[in-house]
Amino acid sequence: MRTLWRWLGKGVAAAVALVLLYQLWIFAHVLWWIDHDPRSTAFMETGLARQQAKNRDAVLRHKWVPYDRISNNLKRAVVAAEDARFVEHAGFDVAGIQKAFQKNVKKGRLVAGGSTITQQLAKNLFLSGERSFLRKGQEVVITLMIESTWSKRRILEVYLNVIEWGNGIYGAEAASRRYYKKSAATLSRDQAARMAAMIPNPRWYENHRGSRLYQRRVVLIKRYMGSVAVPR
């Protein structure tokens, strides 16, 4: 029996060590990306694999642009659409989490996350798209890492450059070229609102921008984008 407990203890210790090593690996990347731009993300790699399963020659459309070369209209539209209190909180919107919790309890499963921009970025950079409490817990840890080391400006810059904006389309510049044949720096207020409205389900909205739901989102974003604060 003692031998069994000894081996069990060693197994638990090894598992804990592996978890800690994984957290250190993630934190090392977070620190590196303070002033180095991510070349790819977990979501990009998943998206590329999905496309190459249908066409092995498929490539992603993605071009990094610095924060100052992204329209203020798009920054405001995205913050208004996804996280109106972005500059105020430390990575978590308590009101949003409460609403998501109530929705999850009502459904009896994890269907909503109340995710802030930083939480979405954590997921995009490192995690899969599955919904589970374990993955949500890891998302929280990564969010804390990012918020404790990056400026809000850097968080929004990386977010705008890596999120999905359609099938195989990642980042503001590639999306702006795809939908409006222009640079992300020159997006108008209306164009920015329309791009921001796609974020919750970009591959669907890419071909359904005439839907009522999409149009309602655009109207709401345009109504509130002038009143939100964004990093300078």
From Swiss-Prot:
It is a single-pass membrane protein. The keyword Cell wall biogenesis/degradation applies. Keywords: Cell inner membrane, Cell membrane, Cell shape, Cell wall biogenesis/degradation, Glycosyltransferase, Membrane, Peptidoglycan synthesis, Transferase, Transmembrane, Transmembrane helix. Disulfide bonds: none annotated. Signal peptide: none annotated. InterPro entries: Glyco_trans_51 (IPR001264), Lysozyme-like_dom_sf (IPR023346), PBP_transglycosylase (IPR036950), Pep_trsgly (IPR011812). Pathway: Cell wall biogenesis; peptidoglycan biosynthesis. Its EC number is 2.4.99.28. It is an enzyme of class 2 (transferase). One of its GO terms (cellular component) is plasma membrane. It comes from the Bacteria. It comes from Thiobacillus denitrificans (strain ATCC 25259 / T1). It is found in: Cell inner membrane. This is Biosynthetic peptidoglycan transglycosylase. GO terms for molecular function: pentosyltransferase activity; peptidoglycan glycosyltransferase activity. Peptidoglycan polymerase that catalyzes glycan chain elongation from lipid-linked precursors. The chain crosses the membrane at residues 14-34. Its main location: membrane. The gene is mtgA.
